Amino acid sequence: MPKLPAILLILSTFVTIPCVHASPVFPFSLGIRDSIMIAHSFKGEQFGPAQNVHGATYTVDVTFRSKALVPKCNWVVDIGEASTALGRILSKYNFKNLDEVFPEGENTTTEFMCKAIHGDLAKFFCTDRAKTGGGERFKGSICVKLWESHKAWACYEANV
């Protein structure tokens, strides 16, 4: 049997690696990215110095997952529409003190913010968009990941 060139051996290893975001339930995915800068403080001794007002810059990754592509378009969701919607949603939080955006005493942890942004996206893609005739209701899963740094992140994912 002839030996394969080293580059082909390396490439063949990558070909067999499945998509990290793929799942048997939702084999298709589309991801978008944006960022926000916020200030906030936490309530409770367990938060130590983070009880004081401090800032954070989040990288925001959103992944839309679906069982099938939208007929005729062959996409999970319109990437331009998704990017615009995410930008509008994030503008509610960007350059804001979250202590003034959410009810008093709400700990706006990274996990909490993932769920809040997810709720805003779900409302847009599953309710508002369909009501305005902007498109069909999105069917699938939305995953919101906020990166605090290259070392720490949080996610919230749910079917919509």
How should these model regions be labeled?
Residues 8-160:
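Charge-rich, low-complexity N-terminal segments
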